[in-house]
Amino acid sequence: MTQSTSVSKGGRVSRKAKKNPDGTMSIVDHLRELRTRLLRALAAIAVTTIIGFIWYEHGIPAWAIGPLHVPRLPSLGEILKEPYCSLPPSARATFSADNECRLLATSPFEMFMLRMKMGGLAGLVMACPIWLIEIWRFITPGLLKNERRWTLSVGTIAGFLFVLGVVAAYLVLPMGLDVLLHLGDSTQISALTGEKYFNFVIALILVFGLSFEVPLFTAMLNLAGVVHYEQLKDKRRIMIVVIFIFAAIATPGQDPISMLVLALTLVVLMELALQFTRIHDRRAARHVSEWEGLSDDEASPLKVAPSSIPAAESIYDGDHKGIAGGGDAHPAGGSGPIPKPSPVTAPTRAPSASESPTPTPSPAPSDSPTSGSHHAPPAAVLRRGPRSWNDSTGDNDGKPGQDTIQSSSFDDVL
């Protein structure tokens, strides 16, 4: 991203950052964009905080537009003290002349600080669409399409679970206070200060809200392949015990009502997460290859049994004559069965031009009882031994006039 300078008609210099075609940015450009996003988010939070500061003392009256009737919205102060004021008068101290339920302040700045805390918290909640959009626009360019989809889905589910936890904490708060403030009411009477009461409520809300995110975290670990359903199934009882211990320690009031509500809700959510991991593992098992579950030092299974090979079809036609049989090498039309090859004959040596024909000698008289004529050997005879070709008509094994071919496997082939 580069920066360009332009001069307006009024003489004012404006600097606009040009975006690179490939979407890359330098570190300075990233810091500049981060500063812009933070300033926008802080400006929105500041405006909504002012609205929350005013809303702390003044509720929004009821109004109606045609058939639509909107009831009165109580002030933030009334919403904050509602769980405490729902207790019976015998469980809380009342120091006002009109016997109105109010929180106790023991320092000059306690009222102002409580109002600022409630206004800031309300402003943060009311401005959440703006600062969430700014965060999303800052991180979106660095994410792929599937990463954007997963981030948006996980963020939406996480926000819903946190809000569900906040609502559950607010509903459990009166019952928890009722149990805690009646444990020693015969000896003491409660007079809660605004600061301690606010800290107690915020702690309970955060515990419930963050605890409701544990099932989502478990499902994400399963999607990442860290944990599986079989592992969680074997440790289900241990998980339930751990959840009850966590609920007993994490709830700020240490009352059994808050502990039981938090523990039972977490058990139900964890069971839903377990069923999600079971379905996901079952679907993933259908697409897992045989070697994906093996470690690095294990060999993958091989299929040693060869598959059956079909018999080859004959390329010859029984009715077609080969070359040796007088058929054509290429049938008419350029297609058809390939002719059979002609049989291989024994090689013969043709006489060269320099060689002159040798007269055939007359056969020598023989004393053998067999009568008959004896033909002269050819000029070249194929022999087996030191000499491959014998051009002479000399003796063979001391018997002149007889040159024979020794029998061998090679002769049989020929």
From Swiss-Prot:
Residues 1-21, 315-414 are annotated as: Disordered. GO terms for cellular component: TAT protein transport complex. Residues 323-336 have a biased composition (Gly residues). The keyword Membrane applies. The chain crosses the membrane at residues 45-65, 119-139, 157-177, 200-220, 238-258, 259-279. Keywords: Cell membrane, Membrane, Protein transport, Translocation, Transmembrane, Transmembrane helix, Transport. Residues 345-357 have a biased composition (Low complexity). Pfam families: TatC. It is a multi-pass membrane protein. GO terms for biological process: intracellular protein transmembrane transport; protein transport by the Tat complex. It is found in: Cell membrane. The keyword Hydrolase does not apply. InterPro entries: Sec-indep_translocase_CS, TatC. One of its GO terms (molecular function) is proton motive force dependent protein transmembrane transporter activity. Residues 403-414 have a biased composition (Polar residues). The Tat system comprises two distinct complexes: a TatABC complex, containing multiple copies of TatA, TatB and TatC subunits, and a separate TatA complex, containing only TatA subunits. Substrates initially bind to the TatABC complex, which probably triggers association of the separate TatA complex to form the active translocon. Belongs to the TatC family. PANTHER family: SEC-INDEPENDENT PROTEIN TRANSLOCASE PROTEIN TATC, SEC-INDEPENDENT PROTEIN TRANSLOCASE PROTEIN TATC, CHLOROPLASTIC-RELATED. Part of the twin-arginine translocation (Tat) system that transports large folded proteins containing a characteristic twin-arginine motif in their signal peptide across membranes. Together with TatB, TatC is part of a receptor directly interacting with Tat signal peptides. This is Sec-independent protein translocase protein TatC. The lineage of its organism: Bacteria, Bacillati, Actinomycetota, Actinomycetes, Mycobacteriales. The gene is tatC.
